[in-house]
Amino acid sequence: ISKLVNTDLDFEMLQSLLVGNSVEFYDEDEKIKPGIDNCQYTLGTIRKKKLRKVMEKGKELKEPAQSIYMIPETFKIARILFYEFGPDRSFDAIYSEYELKDSTQLFPMKMNYTIKAQKTVKIDLVYSKIVLNEEQTFPFKIPENYEAISIKEKK
């Protein structure tokens, strides 16, 4: 995925994308511009008008752009859109079918991801069951005939 979107993805970024949380690829010093588009709140690194020109006319961006679309009633993320330099280089994540889990947290049960680069990759993800904040165990036994080895670090 990192090669397709031309950025370093760490575990926290990937986890955020899988559960519908915000992911920021923009420069921390960059100003975020608020707006409203199709009855959703938006936050983006470029104005809506400029983004539409890029989307409709295939113009190239001078810098990467990010837009986040939020559902007004819940302020949950409906869509995260990243545009990269060059035509047809983008990452689009759409979150839908939010359900209340543990009577405290809204969680997207359906996600659609589209990565456009030299090739287009589409991933549709639907959760059937989600359990939050449950402690995980990994039970295993080490065989008696196991001999421990030590690994030396390379310098």
Where are these regions (language model features)?
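Scaffold/interface architecture of coatomer-like assemblies
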Residues: 20-21
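Acidic/charged, solvent-exposed loop-and-adjacent secondary-structure segments enriched in E/D, K/R, S/T
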Residues: 1-15
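Phosphate-interacting basic helix/loop segments used at nucleotide- and nucleic-acid interfaces
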Residues: 26-27, 31
